[in-house]
């Protein structure tokens, strides 16, 4: 098959560097490499040079950090979405945004196809492709890992050598990682055995090892407006600055390490270690404020929504009608989530040190054990009689034979 232009999600790694000449060989096409900056702090000039060296006709470096935080991270934070009780969805949130940028450039360049370097075993192939199908239904999608017969890193290096492309990729001796402004993930090597405890001195790249910390407790205050963090210690920051600041503080105190065996969308279990320092702090603070501001029914129902929201994000269904509808519900709940949370960070732990809100539903006069004017304790008897009536009726009707009244 011959194509005119293919837009490739390019990272600068070995896989996507091999894909460029492979696409040109198999589709006789021009390859446009797209690098989306979601906070991975790579050397983008070196990546651009590598893309051209491997045969790209054009390279886009897209700064998407602010969009990532405002349009993906904060809506997920407001939802309280955590996959399987642990994973804060760092990679899952980034993939739909990257795919969206690929679609935008494919339209701009009038491309025939979009290609990606996700393997046939992982979740990312699904996340990329369902997003592309949602936003550009008729464009062709190319997934080389499901097509070519290159089976190993050595095969890929040999392929580049055959093409006369000399790039100094080293033998794989480190973990498979994914990095953005929200998190850093680690998979592979000894982590593939769930019985092995991670060697934090070897694994961790951002967060300090909590077992060797000698830090002092640090108090911070985070102010929220409609569920969105806007200030740290009274200082207003833009979304990227705020998250970077909390990443730094969390990392210094050993906060945000998650070791999880998770259920992949494609049917297998995988084990990963995630570093999410700022995200862990924000989730904790946001939840503390919701305890203060949301009524019981809303808080409890929102917990169910959070589970489904997390599954949708994990599965790559960011642009689905259901995710958008759930976000509308979440936004309504967050209208009253305003206020400040005070936290203490210390040796891998977060401690709540106080919270306040103009929308606080906590009324001291109601909660006090002392005599008060707002709550008549005698009213409780009638409430209990009505609340317990269904159980009383069930007990009367289904009373076992021989039971005494």
Swiss-Prot record:
Domain of life: Bacteria
Keywords, in A-Z order: Amino-acid biosynthesis, Arginine biosynthesis, ATP-binding, Cytoplasm, Ligase, Nucleotide-binding
Transmembrane segments: none
Catalytic activity: L-citrulline + L-aspartate + ATP = 2-(N(omega)-L-arginino)succinate + AMP + diphosphate + H(+)
Disulphide linkage map: none
Swiss-Prot/TrEMBL GO biological process terms: argininosuccinate metabolic process; L-arginine biosynthetic process; urea cycle
Binding-site positions, L-aspartate: 119, 123-124
GO cellular component: cytoplasm
InterPro entries, sorted: Arginosuc_syn_C, Arginosuc_syn_N, Arginosuc_synth, Arginosuc_synth_CS, Arginosuc_synth_type_1_subfam, AS_cat/multimer_dom_body, Rossmann-like_a/b/a_fold
Pathway: Amino-acid biosynthesis; L-arginine biosynthesis; L-arginine from L-ornithine and carbamoyl phosphate: step 2/3
GO molecular function, one term: argininosuccinate synthase activity
Binding site for ATP: 9-17, 117
UniProt KW Protein transport keyword: no
Localization: Cytoplasm
EC number per UniProt: 6.3.4.5
Residue numbers binding L-citrulline: 87, 92, 123, 127, 176, 185, 262, 274
Major place of residence: cytoplasm
Any single Pfam family the record assigns to this protein: Arginosuc_synth
Summary of subunit composition and partner proteins: Homotetramer.
Protein family per UniProt: Belongs to the argininosuccinate synthase family. Type 1 subfamily.
NCBIfam families: argG, PRK00509.1
Protein name (database record): Argininosuccinate synthase
């Amino acid at each position: 098959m011959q194509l005119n232009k293919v837009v490739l999600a390019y990272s600068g790694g070995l896989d996507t560097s091999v894909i460029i000449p492979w696409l040109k060989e198999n589709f006789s096409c021009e390859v446009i490499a797209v690098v989306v900056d979601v906070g991975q702090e790579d050397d983008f000039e070196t990546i651009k040079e590598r893309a051209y060296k491997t045969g790209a006709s054009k390279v886009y470096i897209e700064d998407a950090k602010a969009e990532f935080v405002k349009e993906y991270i904060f809506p997920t934070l407001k939802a309280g979405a955590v996959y399987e009780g642990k994973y804060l969805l760092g990679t899952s949130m980034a993939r739909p945004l990257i795919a969206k940028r690929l679609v935008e450039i494919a339209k701009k360049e009038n491309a025939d196809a979009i290609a990606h370097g996700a393997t046939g075993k992982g979740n990312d192939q699904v996340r990329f492709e369902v997003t592309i199908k949602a936003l550009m239904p008729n464009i062709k999608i190319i997934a080389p890992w499901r097509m070519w017969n290159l089976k190993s890193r050595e095969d890929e290096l040999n392929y580049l050598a055959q093409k006369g492309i000399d790039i100094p990729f080293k033998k794989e001796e480190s973990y498979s990682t994914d990095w953005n402004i929200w998190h850093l993930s680690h998979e592979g090597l000894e982590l593939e055995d769930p019985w092995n405890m991670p060697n934090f001195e070897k694994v961790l790249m951002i967060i300090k090892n909590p077992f060797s910390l000698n830090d002092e407790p640090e108090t911070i205050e985070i102010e929220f407006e409609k569920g969105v963090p806007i200030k740290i210690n009274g200082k207003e920051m833009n979304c990227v600055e705020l998250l970077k600041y909390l990443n730094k503080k969390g990392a210094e105190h050993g906060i945000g390490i998650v070791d999880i065996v998770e259920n992949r969308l494609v049917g297998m279990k995988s084990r990963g270690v995630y570093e999410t320092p700022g995200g862990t702090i924000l989730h904790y603070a946001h939840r503390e404020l919701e305890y203060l501001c949301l009524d019981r029914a809303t808080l409890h129902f929102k917990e169910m929504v959070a589970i489904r929201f997390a599954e949708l994000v994990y599965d790559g269904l960011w642009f689905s009608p259901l995710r958008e509808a759930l976000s509308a519900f979440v936004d309504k709940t967050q209208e009253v989530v305003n206020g400040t949370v005070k936290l203490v960070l210390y040796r891998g732990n977060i401690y709540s040190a106080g919270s306040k809100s103009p929308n606080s539903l906590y009324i001291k006069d109601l909660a006090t054990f002392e005599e008060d004017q707002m709550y008549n304790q005698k009213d409780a008897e009638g409430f209990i009689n009505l609340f317990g009536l269904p159980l009383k009726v069930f007990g009367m009707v289904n009373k076992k034979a021989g039971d005494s009244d």
